[in-house]
Every structure is written in structure tokens, then in C-alpha cells.
């Protein structure tokens, strides 16, 4: 399993929007996502390298957690499960925990490869920059 945890200086609701609004996800993920954020909802991801992933939303509680399964569109045997957990962390801050685990043996290699992916190692910086561009105009006193 790959796990990344970061505390960001944003309210839970703003972090949730940054994780789930397709336009903002495109900024920090680098690809495009289309999804139905309901239990059992379908998703499709176009990755920055041109690859495609399909998936299904397993469970979602707005502002708290999102769990989905996804796989390369051309390899349905490489399924992994991704979970986002958002928690308040003091005044004006939120903790984000992102976990990805393989669900079938073939996915283990892909998940291990993702551990070194720049999107994981820089998630905190990239997500914060995406949040800042999107929400700076809404936040009084944010510079």
C-alpha cells in the first residue's frame, strides 16, 4: 500500500472541493477526471501521459471520505483502491490522507511504481498551489 498524509492550511470544505471538482483535480493531478460522486458512480480518468483509467466510486461522504476502485482502461486486471480521508486539523487547517492499495496481484507493481510518482511526492505542494489559485480570491487576508 502507498500512503501519503499532509496537513494543509485550508478548511475541510475547501479541501474537499479541491479533491473532487474536476477543474481543480486537473490542476494537481495533471489529467482530467469525470466522475459521478455517488456510491456506485462511474468514473473515467485521462492521465497526463495519454493513458486512460476507468473506475467506480465505492463510497463517499461529502467532506469526509471518498473511496474508489480504478484500473487502466486496457487492463482490467490491475485494479487498485484509492481512499481520500479529510479531517479537520485545528483552526483553518485540514489533514488529508491518501491511500492506494492493489486489489489483485497484477496491480501491486503499478501501485509500487506510483509510490515514486511525482504526483505522490509533491502532492502537498501541488494541491496547495491549485487550492491557492482557485480559492485565494474567496479568502479574506490570504496573499
Question: What feature does the model see in each segment?
Answer:
Residues 1-34:
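Hydrophobic ligand-binding cavity/cleft-lining segments
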Residues 1-9, 90-97, 143:
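Aromatic-glycine hotspot motif
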Residues 13, 64, 126:
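Glycine-centered loop/turn positions within well-structured domains
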Residues 16, 28, 70-71, 115-116, ...:
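Signature tryptophan residues that serve as conserved aromatic anchors
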Residues 20-21, 30, 62, 128-133:
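Residues at helix-coil transition
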Residues 34, 44-93, 97, 101-104:
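Hydrophobic-ligand binding "helix-grip"
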Residues 102-143:
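A conserved amphipathic terminal alpha-helix motif
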Amino acid at each position: 500500500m502507498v500512503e501519503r498524509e499532509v496537513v494543509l492550511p485550508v478548511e475541510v470544505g475547501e479541501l474537499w472541493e479541491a479533491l473532487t471538482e474536476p477543474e481543480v483535480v486537473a490542476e494537481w493531478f495533471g489529467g482530467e477526471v469525470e466522475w459521478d460522486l455517488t456510491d456506485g458512480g462511474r468514473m473515467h480518468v485521462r492521465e497526463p501521459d495519454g493513458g486512460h483509467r476507468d473506475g467506480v466510486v465505492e463510497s463517499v461522504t461529502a467532506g469526509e471520505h471518498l473511496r474508489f476502485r480504478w484500473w487502466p482502461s486496457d487492463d482490467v486486471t490491475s485494479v487498485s483502491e484509492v481512499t481520500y480521508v479529510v479531517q479537520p486539523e485545528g483552526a483553518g487547517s485540514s489533514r488529508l490522507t491518501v491511500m492506494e492499495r492493489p486489489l489483485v496481484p497484477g496491480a501491486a507493481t503499478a501501485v509500487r511504481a506510483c509510490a515514486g510518482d511525482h504526483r505522490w511526492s509533491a502532492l502537498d505542494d501541488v494541491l496547495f498551489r491549485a487550492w491557492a489559485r482557485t480559492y485565494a480570491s474567496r479568502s479574506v487576508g490570504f496573499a
